[in-house]
Amino acid sequence: MKRTYQPHNRPRKSTHGFRARMATKNGRNVINRRRAKGRKKLSV
């Protein structure tokens, strides 16, 4: 059986990357929450 996680950088960045997050209001909320929490990495 094939495992579920087959990493590829392009889809990873296009769905979870900083630019993708900033593109929508909810994504900006995610970034702001992570900033408020003091996360070292805001996105992948």
UniProtKB/Swiss-Prot annotation:
Coiled coil: none annotated. Signal peptide: none annotated. One of its GO terms (cellular component) is ribosome. It comes from the Bacteria. One of its GO terms (biological process) is translation. Transmembrane segments: none annotated. InterPro entries: Ribosomal_bL34, Ribosomal_bL34_CS. The keyword Ribonucleoprotein applies. Pfam families: Ribosomal_L34. Residues 1-19, 31-44 have a biased composition (Basic residues). Residues 1-44 are annotated as: Disordered. Keywords: Ribonucleoprotein, Ribosomal protein. GO terms for molecular function: structural constituent of ribosome. Belongs to the bacterial ribosomal protein bL34 family. HAMAP family: Ribosomal_bL34. This is Large ribosomal subunit protein bL34. The lineage of its organism: Bacteria, Pseudomonadati, Campylobacterota, Epsilonproteobacteria, Campylobacterales. The gene is rpmH.
